[in-house]
Amino acid sequence: MGKKRIVFFACLLLFTVLLRFSYAGITTESPLSVEQTLSSSNGIYELGFFSPNNSQNLYVGIWFKGIIPRVVVWVANRETPTTDTSANLAISSNGSLLLFNGKHGVVWSIGENFASNGSRAELTDNGNLVVIDNASGRTLWESFEHFGDTMLPFSSLMYNLATGEKRVLTSWKTDTDPSPGVFVGQITPQVPSQVLIMRGSTRYYRTGPWAKTRFTGIPLMDDTYASPFSLQQDANGSGFFTYFDRSFKLSRIIISSEGSMKRFRHNGTDWELSYMAPANSCDIYGVCGPFGLCIVSVPLKCKCLKGFVPHSTEEWKRGNWTGGCARLTELHCQGNSTGKDVNIFHPVTNVKLPDFYEYESSVDAEECHQSCLHNCSCLAFAYIHGIGCLIWNQNLMDAVQFSAGGEILSIRLAHSELGGNKRNKIIVASTVSLSLFVILTSAAFGFWRYRVKHKAYTLKDAWRNDLKSKEVPGLEFFEMNTIQTATNNFSLSNKLGQGGFGSVYKGKLQDGKEIAVKQLSSSSGQGKEEFMNEIVLISKLQHRNLVRVLGCCIEGEEKLLIYEFMLNKSLDTFVFDARKKLEVDWPKRFDIVQGIARGLLYLHRDSRLKVIHRDLKVSNILLDEKMNPKISDFGLARMYEGTQCQDKTRRVVGTLGYMSPEYAWTGVFSEKSDIYSFGVLLLEIIIGEKISRFSYGEEGKTLLAYAWESWGETKGIDLLDQDLADSCRPLEVGRCVQIGLLCVQHQPADRPNTLELLAMLTTTSDLPSPKQPTFVVHSRDDESSLSKDLFTVNEMTQSMILGR
């Protein structure tokens, strides 16, 4: 009897422990009490009640499970704590999530009611508390849209100017008081955006504008920086700044009660501080005032920009620099064409760019300079890699000079600042000489215009004759004015993206037909042979998974290809986008993968001549209105007849990361070269990361190395982007990972051919075990290219080829 009693109490204790630590979900019938917690399925996060610093106040929060001391990452009722130990968190009858106080009713709620037949609250594996509709599975509310002081991986700061919605970080009042503090972290609606910390209504710290993968005001974020961030801004006035960190299982970004933005990563034992800002006195906003330059040193040093002097010498002597500087010589600006009053620009290097910049779109560096020069309100400009042209029409505020890194800021000065007040030399020319010069110049210009126009017509006729000799049926020749009208003169609003050899624009012909226009840039390296190759090849290849060319336009040196318009653009706009990736769930991705394989099979086997694409990658897969994939960009493709199965070139073309070892190293390409590229593409689609940007762990594992390691540990099932976990079929995902690894094996003979590849994707037959890939390339640049003696990127020498 005694033993039975012991067993009974042991079972009761176990039940209590399981109830305490393994609560499954919150529903109307199953509220969460003070003694219970709700865990994420991966065991990383936990939701429950806590009391900071052993106070009497009770808060509902999320923290890292099993980490001591406890690190709270989100608080529900941060402004309304309760002291009632009978409080509980529950789903109301109208589907809302409420915190009930046993004595005083509702203490906190999500503030929304839903027309729902039932809902539940769950804690996801990325620490997001979600309220889900039971019937549809739709997310009704999520904590990631209602920040506290912490960002977790896959969460986003955002703004929407149309709706006024913002997601910001708000500090705790103190380290032990979760109520809102005075510091707020947000992204600004400028283009490009920057992260800004406000102290009440005053600017406290800013990162500088975002430049593709880095913040320009953080010198540690150089071109080699593996950025865990992503910024998307659109023309409708909204922006999303998303935090990714795949290199560490546990990581977070917080805004502390003292106003510091900190990034922590857990090494398995302790939290490591990997970044903190403000990091020095110069990081404090506007410490040197307008037109002042803060020099990063100990102690802090302020100086005025060239051409400026302290606004108040006495204040500067006392160490109060916030009054800033005033211009020494006033500007005289009347178009800045000629004359002694012409303004000049003085470059300042290693600078954190000032605040209140404005973005000038679609201009190069020289046009940026001229735009500022001819705008009398423009005080400075900068042309930044990854951004383009920025100009300043307001006081230059919060400029910092680093010992290394930073950007070049060109500030506007009076011409006299260049070399003192020396008198300018005056060049006097006689009226007769000037008149003669004008006459000769006009005559020369007229003759040049005639030669250019004549050459343009001659070139156009030569191109037409060459294409006609290739017997390209159904190929239409478009006039330039037709394409200019269709694309609104190649306006920026019509630009769809950047292709392998130039820009791509959306157009609409007079009959209402939508087209895509590929404008080949003069610097692309694609000459007549490559252009002819792409026209002839695509026009003769017909398959539902290949893009269709409608015609071309040749006007002088201008070469345009006109394609059928793909409504959903390219696959990379979905797979690598933090928001749009959710529109392409796993079943749809698997369909896309099979479609690409079918298109590749046609190129390799089913057309009369074998076609090797040589530049197969995610950005070259276009999607129609039904999300059907179509392989595009055939400028680098090669064809050969009969039994020939490989070729060799001295000029290797393609994109770094997608190129097979034998092709990149020796110039040998074959069907197996495209198979290698397909394997990389398949793994990118599964993981949701670009190979050129992927880096995992302290060793900086490449995407292929990471996939190989994952396949060895879990057969690759954990590789799928976690945001797609609900839609995945684990065995199918694991099989695709194995197929991807089979495709990227070092030896071409070990890789499947295209027929075998499609069979692997469409059947459940046994697969061989892959061998470890050895050719792994690590690059920080998007779609970087090789350029060595053996390699020439986006250039090629090839013979004219004919398709079927």
From Swiss-Prot:
Cytoplasmic side: 447-804
Gene Ontology molecular function, alphabetical: ATP binding; calmodulin binding; carbohydrate binding; protein serine kinase activity; protein serine/threonine kinase activity; ubiquitin protein ligase binding
Domain Protein kinase: 490-775
Phosphoserine: modified positions: S524, S539, S619, S632, S692
Pfam families named in the record: B_lectin, DUF3403, PAN_2, PK_Tyr_Ser-Thr, S_locus_glycop
Disulfide bridge positions per record: C282-C294, C288-C302, C368-C389, C372-C378
Segments forming domain EGF-like: 278-314
Domain Bulb-type lectin: 25-144
CDD domains in the record: B_lectin (cd00028), PAN_AP_plant (cd01098), STKc_IRAK (cd14066)
Classification via InterPro entries: Bulb-type_lectin_dom, Bulb-type_lectin_dom_sf, Kinase-like_dom_sf, Pan_app, Prot_kinase_dom, Protein_kinase_ATP_BS, S-locus_recpt_kinase_C, S_locus_glycoprot_dom
Catalytic reaction equation(s): L-seryl-[protein] + ATP = O-phospho-L-seryl-[protein] + ADP + H(+); L-threonyl-[protein] + ATP = O-phospho-L-threonyl-[protein] + ADP + H(+)
Subcellular location: Cell membrane
Keyword annotations of the record: ATP-binding, Cell membrane, Disulfide bond, EGF-like domain, Glycoprotein, Kinase, Lectin, Membrane, Nucleotide-binding, Phosphoprotein, Receptor, Serine/threonine-protein kinase, Signal, Transferase, Transmembrane, Transmembrane helix
Start and end residues of each stretch annotated as CaM-binding: 579-596
Bilayer topology: Single-pass type I membrane protein
TM annotation in the entry: 426-446
Extracellular compartment residues: 25-425
Name used for this protein in its record: G-type lectin S-receptor-like serine/threonine-protein kinase At1g61490
Organism the protein comes from: Arabidopsis thaliana
Lineage: Eukaryota, Viridiplantae, Streptophyta, Embryophyta, Tracheophyta
